[in-house]
Amino acid sequence: MNMKKWIAAALACSALALSACGGQGKDAAAPAANPGKVYRVASNAEFAPFESLDSKGNVEGFDVDLMNAMAKAGNFKIEFKHQPWDSLFPALNNGDADIVMSGVTITDDRKQSMDFSDPYFEITQVVLVPKGKKVSSSDDLKKMNKVGVVTGHTGDFSVSKLLGNDNPKIARFENVPLIIKELENGGLDSVVSDSAVIANYVKNNPAKGMDFVTLPDFTTEHYGIAVRKGDEATVKMLNDALEKVRESGEYDKIYAKYFAKEGGQAAK
């Protein structure tokens, strides 16, 4: 399939799959779990278009716009803080953050140590390679000399499952920009990461000559907003607000801003 059509179709499917996640809404703004509190949102702003830093060092992106819309709908206050990926969950569990929103996939393992909101985005893992490089199965991935992943991301988990956790062919990096730069410089044969992030990179950097493919070994994943284990009040606050944002149509507007189809038509 033509790459531009594939990107548009993939993003449209994400929107369709998640539009049914919300339930029946409520007319009044949901009360905050702790009225007057400013909820500290930890995020790794190296994951465009979900979060990145603007010219002034502020966190921006899909996750930020969505959380701001949720805060308005749910009548609570938030502040985002950029920090390294590997510090997000420790910050949550030791009380330095109240919420983690950073393209976090809901997994059974993570649910053992934290709670999640309802899903708000659907993705899969994809393989980013230079155009012309053949990748059609996991066997092709296994034949490569170096496969780049971000440490602790689900791309890391997926590749480790295929190749073995200690396989020297797996090159682990701190963030997505670093692994993509290494691929561009020829230090890697491929990168495995989240579909929406890789699609955004390919769309915005056509001169780099990159392409991406999906493999049947990679399953569908859902992003959720993480809170401390047992914090039911904050989970309810977030779910109620997310439901309102979906029902008002604001979710679709934010989605279209970052994941519009070719020609500017919003993905539905």
From Swiss-Prot:
The answer, when asked if Cell membrane is one of the entry's keywords, is yes
Q: Which UniProt keywords apply?
A: Amino-acid transport, Cell membrane, Lipoprotein, Membrane, Palmitate, Signal, Transport
Q: Name one GO biological process term.
A: amino acid transport
Q: Which GO terms describe its cellular component?
A: plasma membrane
Mark the residues modified by lipid (N-palmitoyl cysteine).
C21
Picking any one GO molecular function of the record gives: ligand-gated monoatomic ion channel activity
Q: Which cysteines are joined by disulfide bonds?
A: none
> What Pfam families does the database record attribute to this sequence?
SBP_bac_3
Where is the signal peptide, in residue numbers? 1-20
Where in the cell does this protein reside?
A: Cell membrane
Topology within the bilayer: Lipid-anchor
**What SMART domains does UniProt report for this protein, alphabetically?**
PBPb (SM00062), PBPe (SM00079)
Instruction: Could you list the residues that carry lipid attachment of the S-diacylglycerol cysteine kind.
Output: C21
What is the recorded function of this protein according to its Swiss-Prot or TrEMBL entry?
Involved in histidine transport.
Family, similarity comment:
Belongs to the bacterial solute-binding protein 3 family.
Mind telling me what this protein is named?
Probable histidine-binding protein
